[in-house]
Amino acid sequence: MSGIIATYLIHDDSHNLEKKAEQIAIGLTIGSWTHLPHLLQEQLKQHKGNVIHIEALDEQEHINSYLGKKVSRGLIKIHYPSLNFSPDLPAILTTTFGKLSLDGEIKLIDLTFSDELKKQFPGPKFGIEGIRNLLQVQDRPLLMSIFKGMIGRNIGYLKTQLRDQAIGGVDIVKDDEILFENSLTPLIKRIESGKEVLQSVYETYGHKTLYAVNLTGRTYDLKENAKRAVVAGADILLFNVFSYGLDVLQALVEDDEIPIPIMAHPAVSGAYSSSKLYGFSSPLLLGKLLRYAGADFSLFPSPYGNVALEKEEALLITAALTEEDHYFKKSFSVPSAGIHPGFVPFILRDFGKDVVINAGGGIHGHPNGAQGGGKAFRAAIEATLQGKPLHEVDEINLHSALQIWGNPSHEVKL
């Protein structure tokens, strides 16, 4: 079936899911149906949205209480013909959820693209396998850390932070998403200084680290800024996708003059996906759509930290990023926020080896600094892969980390 199928979670105070579904299908396509002359119906039939599935769900009293009324809940699926929209995300999202998103009681759970439609999207340029090949790391999760406290600091401070994190065994260091173009640490200077530091660490310690630099600026300047970054030697671009739009991400990915991986940050996405009643589902927004548009990495709140996402949601995001699809490479999951070494066994148990463990305070807050923090994480990763409990590991940096943040994983089994 060509076109796209949208799955919605609806809350209906008229208690007629069939009628509500049909209203949506008609309202987002031809506008009306039953009052049209037969000849016009025949002409418009190929453009009409069609309800293909309705599933009633159990009533939930806490939702009724929140809404201040009794509602029927249900999942509905509607097919939208490809004749109705151009094969791009702005058209697809407007068709399936444009004015409907203003309802306030409908959540877009999923979009199922036809094979023909999938061909219009690039998917990740590198994907999990390509990123692993860049780092020459095949047998373990990747470790990522974050520059902290860079606003108002100079290049010397950045170089010191970067060096310590790289020596600690971190695979990727990323800019803070709130670090924009500025006179103290301008984009090109960050890239050039970063390359100098990371090359020195590689020559001395034999460990390769990549630097994800924040791509910022006005939308019409982004491509030029990205190309300047590439010429300067950037390894990875960090991109605040939802501040700009998914289509902007796709445009960057499809540009052959920007041949480096792109890491999608979830900033602003909470405004679209946090509610259980309306907006986008997290697996759709932070999983499927980011992968289709071309993100090599997707950051999202972990189920364990201080900005936690429900575990089921986080795992569904990962499934959308990594499920087999011969049209698209797999994207790296990056569960983030509040991660310390004691959580490593949880992460590997829940997400497997094809994951990026992302830590900020869990590395910089270590008593031996970022070097000690990185080494603690690497020791935790190695021990977990060997099936060894963290409290039995004879590594001083990991021991210190567990004393500070605890070891909630002492009973976790892979």
Swiss-Prot record:
Keywords: Amino-acid biosynthesis, Isomerase, Magnesium, Metal-binding, Methionine biosynthesis. One of its GO terms (biological process) is carbon fixation. Substrate binds at K148, K174, D175, D176, E177, H265, G338, G360, G361. Pathway: Amino-acid biosynthesis; L-methionine biosynthesis via salvage pathway; L-methionine from S-methyl-5-thio-alpha-D-ribose 1-phosphate: step 3/6. The active site is at K99. The keyword Magnesium applies. The modification N6-carboxylysine is found at K174. CDD domains: RLP_DK-MTP-1-P-enolase. Mg(2+) binds at K174, D176, E177. It catalyses: 5-methylsulfanyl-2,3-dioxopentyl phosphate = 2-hydroxy-5-methylsulfanyl-3-oxopent-1-enyl phosphate. It is an enzyme of class 5 (isomerase). The keyword Metal-binding applies. Binds 1 Mg(2+) ion per subunit. Its EC number is 5.3.2.5. One of its GO terms (molecular function) is 2,3-diketo-5-methylthiopentyl-1-phosphate enolase activity. It comes from the Bacteria. Its cofactor is Mg(2+). Pfam families: RuBisCO_large (PF00016), RuBisCO_large_N (PF02788). Has no RuBP-carboxylation activity. Catalyzes the enolization of 2,3-diketo-5-methylthiopentyl-1-phosphate (DK-MTP-1-P) into 2-hydroxy-3-keto-5-methylthiopentenyl-1-phosphate (HK-MTPenyl-1-P). Belongs to the RuBisCO large chain family. Type IV subfamily. Homodimer. PANTHER family: RIBULOSE BISPHOSPHATE CARBOXYLASE (PTHR42704), RIBULOSE BISPHOSPHATE CARBOXYLASE LARGE CHAIN (PTHR42704:SF17). This is 2,3-diketo-5-methylthiopentyl-1-phosphate enolase. It comes from Bacillus mycoides (strain KBAB4).
